Design a protein with these regions (language model features):
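Short, compositionally biased low-complexity segments
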Residues: 39-54, 97-110, 190-191
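Second-shell loop/turn segments in exported
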Residues: 58-64, 115-126, 168-169, 195-205
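Electrostatic, structured charged patches in enzyme active sites and in nucleic-acid/phosphate-binding
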Residues: 39-49, 148, 205-211, 220-223
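Active-site-adjacent substructure of cysteine-protease-like catalytic cores
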Residues: 137-177
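Catalytic cores and adjacent binding grooves of peptidoglycan-active enzymes
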Residues: 10, 15-23, 168-249
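Long non-globular sequence segments
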Residues: 1-86
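Short, solvent-exposed polar/charged micro-motifs at secondary-structure junctions
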Residues: 94-100, 156-162, 238-239
Length: 249
């Protein structure tokens, strides 16, 4: 049998290696899916979100999957240990209302008035508070955040770009309880960190550093985050939301 031309041999070898790799991957996927190979839950893309496990490369995917399924979202929310009550689904106006929402009574931090949040929003809030905010407070102040000052969640209104709610504009994520506005934090010793007063993009002091880390950390767990650098309407708070286009400003 004549040998193939020398210039064809690397191509043939490459095709064989590619085929072998595809077969190996397929066998591995089947083995994992059928349980022949046991994969730790934190590295298993089919395992449900573990809300208390340290975030890894699969956390964003698992969080998005939980947010997208009402049953999975409620199951994950139940594992957080937060105190809340279910809010009946209802329409409160054109483009406004609640679906799969909760009234958050306690979240490991004091919240003042209990915000009404969609399940995806409440789940993202826990992930941010537990895995981003509290570690940042311990890093910069050596103590946890005891309370969060907020400006509310649900409001049946349009998008606000700085001059108030705009007639004819799309509905805000607040209109479906998919947004939460955070104005500042109270530390365990009573000190306050305030977005309007303490925000500095250069993070030149502990308060500014905490706010910068809280803002950046929020971008890992929420779909959209807007802060003082976005526009004047957000100079005094962080706007956190789920749904819509991804943004971190």
């Amino acid at each position: 049998v004549p040998l193939p031309p020398a210039q064809d041999r690397p191509a043939r070898l490459g095709r064989r290696l590619a085929l072998a790799l595809v077969v190996a991957i397929a066998v591995g996927v089947v083995a994992v899916f059928t349980g022949a190979i046991e994969v730790p839950e934190r590295h298993d893309p089919w395992a449900p979100l573990d809300v208390r496990a340290a975030p890894n490369w699969l956390t964003t995917y698992k969080l998005a999957r939980a947010r997208g399924d009402p049953v999975h979202c409620q199951a994950a929310l139940a594992d957080t240990g937060m105190r809340y009550e279910r809010v009946p689904d209802r329409v409160t106006g054109p483009g406004c209302g609640f679906e799969n929402a909760v009234r958050l009574r306690s979240a490991g931090v004091r919240l003042g008035s209990a915000p009404t949040l969609s399940c995806p929003m409440a789940l993202s809030f826990f992930m941010w508070e537990h895995h981003a905010l509290q570690p940042a407070a311990l890093r910069h102040f050596g103590q946890p955040v005891a309370a969060i000052d907020h400006l509310g969640s649900y409001a049946c209104r349009n998008v606000n770009r700085g001059e108030g709610a705009i007639p004819g504009a799309p509905r805000s994520r607040h209109a479906t309880a998919d947004a939460f506005d955070v104005a500042g934090f109270v530390l365990a010793d009573g000190r306050r960190v305030n977005v309007r007063r303490d925000w500095h993009p250069d993070a030149s002091n502990p308060s500014a550093a905490l706010l910068n880390d809280a803002h950046l950390g929020a971008c890992r767990f929420f779909r959209g985050v807007l802060g003082p650098e976005y526009n004047a309407a957000h100079r005094d708070h962080f706007h956190l939301e789920t749904g819509g286009f991804p943004m971190c400003r």
